[in-house]
Amino acid sequence: MKIYDFVSKTDKEVSLDKKNIKMYVCGPTVYNHVHIGNLRPIITFDVLNRLFLELGYNVTFIHNITDIDDKIVNKAKEENIGELELSSYYETQYFDILKTINIHTSNMKFPRVSDHIKDIENYIQKIVNNKFAYLVDGDVYFDTTKSNQYGKISNKKLDELLVGDKSEDNLKKNNPQDFALWKQTTIGLNWDLKFSTGRPGWHTECSCLINKYLGDQIDIHGGGIDLKFPHHENENIQNIAVNNKDLARIWMHVGHLNINNQKMSKSLSNFILAKDLLSEYNTNTVRWFFYQTSYSNPLNFTTENLINSKNQLENIIYNLNIFKSHLIIEQKYNEKNLEFDKSNLIELTNNFNLPNIVSFIEEKIKYSSILLRNKNFEELNKLHFNLSYLLTKILGIIHVNLFDDEAIELLNKWNKLKQEKNFSESDKYRKLLMEKKLL
């Protein structure tokens, strides 16, 4: 399987040895509830993870938790609580969201930055030893002029790049593009290291964790398009400094989520928290909405678009339930000895095309209706199994089983009354089944 690499602008094999995949997706800074824009990358890479596992790859998936940051320090001060108490609370909230949106986590690890300070110290020291960094008044800065590879990820030249974070003291730095690996501070959470008392820079945390858990180069690095520069750029150049190679073979960037064609921001009062969205719409609707557009393109969030996605998916599930009802009535429903046909994944294995898999499912629903009309129950049973598997196991749609003993009894009674031509009574059962969305 090949996936498009946004740096080389070519399709690349997802695994060099055809067996193992190492994947890293930048996680949240846990100082607040995540917003709906944060859901798009993790849902996107959840589907990719599920796909790889289905194809038989051994996938190691790392998704970090940034629990050390100036934002956390400032928020904790506002709320008059400790930084770790604050970050722990929002970390728990984030994991609740992941559970709600049905993220497959059995092969994932979620390392916290605060648990890896010694690793970060050693990683920074390697960069210093290799003469890619310098110390100024207890701060450690990466010298971006030491490599002609800086700008490779964002496709920018050094003299075109923006200056570093506003929080950094540019007067201390040799070059305005240089960034902090370690920041000297006694304010907020800090550690006493050989450099100074302080805390790590954001860009160093991710590259260090990748090296610790996944080695000197990974197969896929993912995240939102907003992280391409400076975060991914700075991650990559550190790996070049330490390991003399790019951090990842494939870089995947998920497009922006706009709200009513505007960038989401608090100033525009269009900032929507994930927990608020999920209190109004279920997980299936939210996931299906994200599948409507190629993961790398911008996606426009509107209530109308969300409702359209909801209706589309509900129609698909409704039809699948109708097909199952008829299979049960005809005593043709049987999932035993059936195996998922991986040819159904062709739209996903073809450069991970999410909108095409949506179209594929809709076309198969139409074809299933033809099979039902023609009473080709054997083929209908196979297709029903494959579509249900694709929706639940690969696309992460939560299955709700409507076929309890009562429902099956209603179906059989309705069918028996029809055969007996007792139409007045059968219509009563038909109405009950329609209310349950089984007919």
UniProtKB/Swiss-Prot annotation:
Which reaction is the catalytic activity of this chain? tRNA(Cys) + L-cysteine + ATP = L-cysteinyl-tRNA(Cys) + AMP + diphosphate
Q: Where is this motif: 'KMSKS' region?
A: 263-267
The cofactors required by this protein are: Zn(2+)
What EC number(s) does this enzyme carry? Answer: 6.1.1.16
- Cofactor binding: number and manner: Binds 1 zinc ion per subunit.
Chief subcellular location: cytoplasm
Q: Name one Pfam family in it.
A: tRNA-synt_1e
Q: Where does Zn(2+) bind?
A: C26, C206, H231, E235
Residues reported to bind ATP: K266
The coiled-coil segments of this chain are: none
A GO cellular component annotation in the UniProt record: cytosol
Q: What keywords sit in the KW lines?
A: Aminoacyl-tRNA synthetase, ATP-binding, Cytoplasm, Ligase, Metal-binding, Nucleotide-binding, Protein biosynthesis, Zinc
Q: Name one GO biological process term.
A: cysteinyl-tRNA aminoacylation
Q: Name one GO molecular function term.
A: cysteine-tRNA ligase activity
Q: Which PANTHER family does the annotation name?
A: CYSTEINE--TRNA LIGASE, CYTOPLASMIC (PTHR10890:SF3), CYSTEINYL-TRNA SYNTHETASE (PTHR10890)
Q: How does it assemble?
A: Monomer.
Name of protein: Cysteine--tRNA ligase
